[in-house]
Amino acid sequence: MTSSTGMEAHNPLTSGDFTEVSEPFRLFAEWLAEAGKSEPNDPNAMTLATVDPDGLPDARMVLLKGLDARGFVFFTNTESAKGRELAQTPKAALVFHWKSLRRQVRVRGPVEQVTADEADAYFATRPRLSQIGAWASSQSRPLEGRFALEAAVASATAKYALGTVPRPPHWTGFRVLPVAIEFWHDRPFRLHDRVVFRREGEGADWSRTRLFP
């Protein structure tokens, strides 16, 4: 485990003193920044959990692409399994786990689509081949073989040539509006630090509760 005792001694956001912090978004942003320095790959990776039409849980890894005062933002194909599940049941849970820091964050709440302007702005920042891929991939649908995917990529590449690749209508972002955010920090002998922040809905005040490990 990478030691950060010097920093922890002076920064309540990154030490056991985080249990006294009153603003969870600020605490999360600090932890994410710390993870960016120590995680070997994708510190913004998170498990996204949804439920299917039968009520069975479904989970996969996605990347956090935005964090603001309202919530946690990711982008995807609305025709994918997760897109269809969120359309039917717009609620989700997220889990961030940073092994290098021995920390975990859990998030739960309703989900909304981002605005078209937000989706357009983010799509414009993606590498061109990723933009092409958004058109070429019928995400979560059966694929006959790799050649079929490559043919779809070639077709989309030819279609847009050297021009701007527009955002597909089925590609957008979702924002998880948290009603609960739990922070977990590993401690010796499994005497971990756990704090959960809860609120009744967006804009409501947060309550803070320390939990037994």
From Swiss-Prot:
GO terms for biological process: pyridoxine biosynthetic process. Substrate binds at residues 65, 122, 126, 130, 190-192. Signal peptide: none annotated. Keywords: Flavoprotein, FMN, Oxidoreductase, Pyridoxine biosynthesis. It holds the Pfam family PNP_phzG_C. The keyword Ribosomal protein does not apply. Binds 1 FMN per subunit. Pathway: Cofactor metabolism; pyridoxal 5'-phosphate salvage; pyridoxal 5'-phosphate from pyridoxamine 5'-phosphate: step 1/1; Cofactor metabolism; pyridoxal 5'-phosphate salvage; pyridoxal 5'-phosphate from pyridoxine 5'-phosphate: step 1/1. One of its GO terms (molecular function) is FMN binding. InterPro entries: Pyridox_Oxase (IPR000659), Pyridox_Oxase_CS (IPR019740), Pyridox_Oxase_N (IPR011576), Pyridoxamine_oxidase_dimer_C (IPR019576), Split_barrel_FMN-bd (IPR012349). Its EC number is 1.4.3.5. It catalyses: pyridoxamine 5'-phosphate + O2 + H2O = pyridoxal 5'-phosphate + H2O2 + NH4(+); pyridoxine 5'-phosphate + O2 = pyridoxal 5'-phosphate + H2O2. Catalyzes the oxidation of either pyridoxine 5'-phosphate (PNP) or pyridoxamine 5'-phosphate (PMP) into pyridoxal 5'-phosphate (PLP). NCBIfam families: pdxH (TIGR00558), PRK05679.1 (NF004231). This is Pyridoxine/pyridoxamine 5'-phosphate oxidase. It comes from Xanthobacter autotrophicus (strain ATCC BAA-1158 / Py2). The lineage of its organism: Bacteria, Pseudomonadati, Pseudomonadota, Alphaproteobacteria, Hyphomicrobiales.
